[in-house]
């Protein structure tokens, strides 16, 4: 949902440790950004990013909790930074040929003056069904409850996705993917992350559908 170049983290140190059914991870980005120049002497916080995750997988059940924060430069003139925070929880359960999964992500973007740029609750639920040894089906639903965007309460976007994948062999498969989206009439880049790249919906252009078919071969 959120666009812009600020979401790519370079210059990263990452750790992943596995302890039985538990996997722990963490990362630190030393400095990257669009408006800023990355690492700046005497400005340790500028364009930094960090996060941590903890997941468990045991038998048919799996669960994950994740925290992520990025402190992008929002003013190239003053070097002032914002704070974009995300916390996510997700779980899955598998029984026979069916695997169901769902999750929740809390989000809060703060600007240079600590004003709220974006506050939202993002939900998703889906299922994988292995119909045959070769045919796999996936259905998923995504919903973003946008509570506040720069002082406005806008319509909530959502999307339904369906994927069918048929394997000819261990290395070659063909797939069909479709999605229907109900869009929100919002310029996310400017309003939600203070980025210069902007887009607006045209009149009546509040939904879209996409279909793709392809063949994949693994080398």
Where in the sequence are the language-model features?
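Short loop/turn motifs that connect adjacent beta-strands in outer-membrane beta-barrel proteins
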Residues: 21, 134, 170-171, 205
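Surface-exposed coil loops of outer-membrane beta-barrel proteins
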Residues: 1-50, 195-200
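Detector for outer-membrane/organellar transmembrane beta-barrel domains
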Residues: 45, 50-167, 177-181
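Outer-membrane beta-barrel biogenesis signature
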Residues: 1-4, 170-175, 179, 186-192, ...
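Outer-membrane beta-barrel and related beta-rich outer-membrane complex signature
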Residues: 38, 77, 114, 151, ...
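Primarily extracellular Gram-negative trimeric autotransporter adhesin
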Residues: 185-189, 198-206, 217
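Outer-membrane beta-barrel "beta-signal"
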Residues: 162, 168, 203-219
């Amino acid at each position: 949902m959120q666009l812009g170049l600020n979401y790519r983290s370079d210059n990263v140190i990452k750790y992943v440790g596995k302890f039985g059914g538990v996997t722990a991870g963490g990362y630190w980005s030393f400095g990257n950004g669009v408006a800023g120049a990355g690492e700046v002497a005497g400005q340790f916080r500028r364009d930094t990013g960090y996060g941590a995750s903890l997941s468990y997988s045991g038998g048919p059940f799996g669960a994950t909790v994740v925290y992520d924060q990025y402190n992008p430069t929002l003013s190239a003139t003053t070097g002032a930074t914002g704070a974009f925070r995300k916390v996510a929880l997700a779980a899955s359960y598998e029984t026979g040929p069916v695997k169901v999964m769902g999750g929740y992500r809390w989000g809060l973007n703060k600007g240079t003056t600590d004003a709220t740029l974006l506050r939202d609750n993002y939900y998703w639920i889906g299922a994988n069904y292995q119909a045959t040894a070769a045919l796999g089906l996936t259905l998923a639903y995504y919903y973003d409850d946008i509570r506040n965007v720069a002082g406005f309460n806008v319509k909530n976007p959502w999307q339904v996705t369906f994927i069918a994948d048929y394997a000819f062999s261990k290395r070659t498969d063909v797939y069909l993917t479709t999605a229907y989206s109900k869009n929100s009439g919002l310029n996310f880049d400017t309003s939600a992350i203070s980025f210069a790249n902007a887009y607006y919906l045209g009149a009546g252009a509040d939904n879209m559908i996409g279909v793709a078919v392809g063949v994949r071969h693994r080398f």
